[in-house]
From Swiss-Prot:
InterPro entries to which the protein is assigned, alphabetical: PyrdxlP-dep_Trfase, PyrdxlP-dep_Trfase_major, PyrdxlP-dep_Trfase_small, Ser_HO-MeTrfase, Ser_HO-MeTrfase-like, Ser_HO-MeTrfase_PLP_BS, SHMT-like_dom
Site (Plays an important role in substrate specificity): 235
NCBIfam families in the record: PRK00011.1
PANTHER family in the cross-refs: SERINE HYDROXYMETHYLTRANSFERASE, SERINE HYDROXYMETHYLTRANSFERASE 1
Pathway, per record: One-carbon metabolism; tetrahydrofolate interconversion; Amino-acid biosynthesis; glycine biosynthesis; glycine from L-serine: step 1/1
Protein family according to the UniProt entry: Belongs to the SHMT family.
Function: Catalyzes the reversible interconversion of serine and glycine with tetrahydrofolate (THF) serving as the one-carbon carrier. This reaction serves as the major source of one-carbon groups required for the biosynthesis of purines, thymidylate, methionine, and other important biomolecules. Also exhibits THF-independent aldolase activity toward beta-hydroxyamino acids, producing glycine and aldehydes, via a retro-aldol mechanism.
HAMAP family: SHMT (MF_00051)
Organism superkingdom: Bacteria
Descriptive protein name: Serine hydroxymethyltransferase 1
Pfam families (UniProt xref): SHMT
Taxonomic placement: Bacteria, Pseudomonadati, Pseudomonadota, Alphaproteobacteria, Hyphomicrobiales
CDD domains per the UniProt record, alphabetical: SHMT
The keyword Amino-acid biosynthesis belongs to this UniProt entry's keyword annotation: yes
Length: 431
């Protein structure tokens, strides 16, 4: 009897073992296949990445680092982590990489733990200007444990106010300055940030979670050699599994980072995720990834130009990377209402505050749109022009209806067009 139970444990499919979870996954697969994904922080991973993340590496505990584990039997997971480290170093041209952080928040926390003490002062981009929660938001640990000095964008053009950065740095003498964000669509001047950091004796940390794939693909300047340390997620524009990574050229910082990640913040790393990170980093080292990164930027610019041509304002006037913030006020819409209407039309995005937004954070005056997932799917400029026109069609219908319920007829018509478009670009056909 026990033998039969064991056989079932190792052989029963998910569909047989847990039909409720299987059903949810099947519905999510259908959603991803038929909807246009425009959330800037999302992407679509390869079959190889999926296979690595769903592998038997999930069974293995491996506290420590390759060659220095606190558990036995780590010789093969060591291979996976060593490959991830070496590929990360090669991809970004750095001397040290830690691939163990489980998330973007944890990678940033690890840098704080390595370089700061509670109560120290650091600077980061204000959340309302396109920063991240972990860059000092008062609701986040980073804003509770440290003295945070935020900088922002100029009100007239929504570009980074580097004069404000320099002035506040001189006044407040931060120990760390963070450059990088989640909703800033222009090129970052890493050199100027480093000059300011050096002037006040601060570390410069770059959070390139959103643009790492563009950096790797040659479409955005690298933060190295300007920054002391850089963090990035491995999903988003890198097209890997969800997780984090920390990079540096400084051996002393690398030692502090390693100690901060383990044992400072985490115990056993997720070896199946690290294996998948290695696969994604290997993919990003291929020549075709540069073509992908270039197409992402072309597609984002096409989408922004299409929306502008149809009467919408793009924050800062356009985009140099993979994303844009769309100011909806000319269409008399809020981000909350637009996100829901576009969702009903099978276009997925997220409501997002715009700089100096008069609306509440859960309502907002804008939406954030991104090109990475659609580009992975195979969309090029023609498809993103069509996507932009479909977005405008939904927003115009929403304006005409002037209701939270939206315009059912318009949304149904757009939904049919979206399905026709996505059917031309199938994904995961083997499933």
């Amino acid at each position: 009897m026990l033998s039969q139970t064991n056989d079932a444990f190792f052989t029963r499919s998910l569909a047989d073992s847990d039909p409720e979870i299987f059903g949810a996954i099947e519905k999510e697969l259908g959603r991803q296949r038929h909807e246009i994904e425009l959330i800037a922080s999302e992407n679509i991973v390869s079959r190889a990445v999926l296979e690595a993340q769903g592998s038997i590496m999930t069974n293995k505990y491996a506290e420590g680092y390759p060659g220095k584990r606190y558990y036995g039997g780590c010789q093969y997971v060591d291979i996976a982590e060593a490959l991830a480290i070496e590929r990360a170093k090669k991809l970004f041209g750095v001397n040290f990489a830690n691939v163990q952080p489980n998330s973007g928040s944890q990678m940033n926390q690890a840098v704080f733990l390595a370089l700061l003490q509670p109560g120290d002062t650091f600077m980061g981009l204000d959340l309302n200007s396109g920063g991240h929660l972990t860059h000092g938001s008062p609701v986040n640990m980073s804003g509770k444990w440290f003295n945070v000095v935020s900088y922002g964008v100029r009100e007239d053009d929504h570009l980074l106010d580097m004069d404000e950065v320099a002035r506040k740095a001189r006044e407040q003498k931060p120990k760390l300055i963070i450059a990088g964000g989640t909703a800033y669509s222009r090129i970052w001047d890493w050199k100027r940030f480093r000059e300011i950091a050096d002037e006040v004796g601060a570390w410069l940390m770059v959070d390139m979670a959103h643009i790492a794939g563009l950096v790797a693909g040659g479409q955005h300047p690298s933060p190295f050699p300007h920054c002391h340390v850089a963090t990035t997620t491995t999903h988003k524009s890198l097209r890997g599994p969800r997780g984090g990574m920390i990079l540096t050229n400084d051996e002393e910082i690398a030692k502090k980072i390693n100690s901060a990640v383990f044992p400072g913040l985490q115990g056993g790393p997720l070896m199946h995720v690290i294996a998948a990170k290695a696969v994604a980093l290997g993919e990003a080292l291929q020549p075709s990834f540069k073509d992908y990164a270039a197409q992402v930027v072309k597609n984002a610019r096409t989408l922004a130009e299409t929306l502008k041509a149809n009467g919408l304002d793009i924050v800062s006037g356009g985009t140099d990377n993979h994303l844009m913030l769309v100011d909806l006020r000319k269409k008399n819409a809020t981000g909350k209402r637009a996100e829901a209407a576009l969702g009903r039309a099978y276009v997925t995005c997220n409501k997002n505050g715009i700089p100096f937004d008069p609306e509440k954070p859960f309502v907002t005056s804008g939406v954030r749109l991104g090109a990475p997932a659609g580009t992975t799917r195979g969309f090029k400029e023609a498809e993103f022009k069509e996507v932009g026109e479909l977005i405008v069609e939904v927003l115009d219908g929403l304006k005409a209806a002037n209701s939270d319920e939206g315009n059912a007829a318009v949304e149904a018509g757009v939904r049919e067009k979206v399905i026709k478009l996505t059917d031309r670009f199938p994904m995961y056909g083997y499933m």
